[in-house]
Swiss-Prot record:
Keyword DNA damage assigned: yes
Gene name in the database record: nfo
Native source species: Enterobacter sp. (strain 638)
Name of the featured protein: Probable endonuclease 4
Keywords: DNA damage, DNA repair, Endonuclease, Hydrolase, Metal-binding, Nuclease, Zinc
Function: Endonuclease IV plays a role in DNA repair. It cleaves phosphodiester bonds at apurinic or apyrimidinic (AP) sites, generating a 3'-hydroxyl group and a 5'-terminal sugar phosphate.
Binding locations of Zn(2+) 1: 69, 109, 145
Length: 285
């Protein structure tokens, strides 16, 4: 079973995210549980929590179909201790919000060394940041997203993801989310079925599909291997349709939320319908 949707707005209340996802006939969705560009947010009230849970139940979104994303401000590998502590506090709050909402996944960008510490030291800080937060929460898996490798962001190599996982004590509560645009921009080719086979064989060898907890389905305005993060609508960018057809027809991607972060929300419903059709076509073949 494939779960496909988009990163929808929670403006006006978290429950609205589920409603908006249902309107585009999604079977998965992503959201921010707070303003992603602010450090602090008001605590969740019982009313907000209950309304969100009721909307998810009404529209048949189980916890495994929802991939919340944390704040863009958080850097779990920050080289400066004071800033690292601030990020760790905010990340814990994000996990606790998921816990309160009955959600089981939290997607996040791993972190950046800011040219001040080496990659290994930064990856170790990220793993320790995850350990600190997991020790104070229950039931929520920390889902590390691969990055395009812009600036000093880590996570653009599968080896980075594997190193972070290796440093996490509770392996049952850590996973990864693969963003197709980020992977392509980082030098993992997805432009044909053959290239997809190679890239995901490498992913299996280095990280392992057992850790795959979500996908971001995005085409790329950015060039292959450019280390530039620029999303595009499916089939309109430099990746093309084949990668998304491959993913929809491969059972290794079953049972996880796969969400669009493509550039035109007006065609999300069409993109979701197209993705679903690829799966149906394969099953009928």
């Amino acid at each position: 079973m494939k779960y496909v949707g988009a990163h929808v707005s929670a403006a006006g209340g978290l429950a609205n995210a589920a409603i908006r996802a249902a309107e585009i006939e999604a079977t998965a969705f992503a959201l921010f549980t707070k303003n992603q560009r602010q450090w602090r947010a008001a605590p969740l009230t019982p009313e907000i929590i209950n309304d969100f849970k009721a909307a998810c139940e009404k529209y048949n979104f189980g916890p495994g179909q929802i991939l919340p994303h944390d704040s863009y401000l958080i850097n779990l590998g920050h080289p400066v201790q004071e800033a690292l502590d601030k990020s760790r506090e905010a990340f814990l709050d994000e996990l606790q919000r998921c816990e309160q909402l009955g959600l089981t996944l939290l997607n996040f960008h791993p972190g950046s060394h800011l040219m001040q510490i080496d990659e290994d030291a930064c990856l170790a800080r990220i793993a320790e940041s995850i350990n600190i937060a997991l020790a104070q929460t229950e039931g929520v898996t920390a889902v590390i997203e691969n990055t395009a490798g812009q600036g000093s962001n880590l996570g653009f190599k599968f080896e980075h993801l594997a190193a972070i996982i290796d440093g996490v004590e509770d392996k049952t509560r850590v996973g990864v989310c693969i963003d197709t645009c980020h992977a392509f921009a980082a030098g993992y080719d997805l432009r044909s079925q053959e290239e997809c086979e190679k890239t995901f064989a490498e992913f299996e060898r280095i990280v392992g599909f057992k850790y795959l907890r979500g996908m971001h389905l995005n085409d790329a305005k950015s060039a292959f291997g450019s280390r530039v993060d620029r999303h595009h609508s499916l089939g309109e960018g430099n990746i093309g349709h084949d990668a998304f057809r491959f993913i929809m027809q491969d059972p290794r991607f079953d049972g996880i939320p796969m969400v669009l972060e493509t550039v035109n929300p007006d065609i999300w419903a069409e993109e979701i319908a197209w993705l679903k059709a690829q799966q149906t076509a394969e099953q009928a073949a």
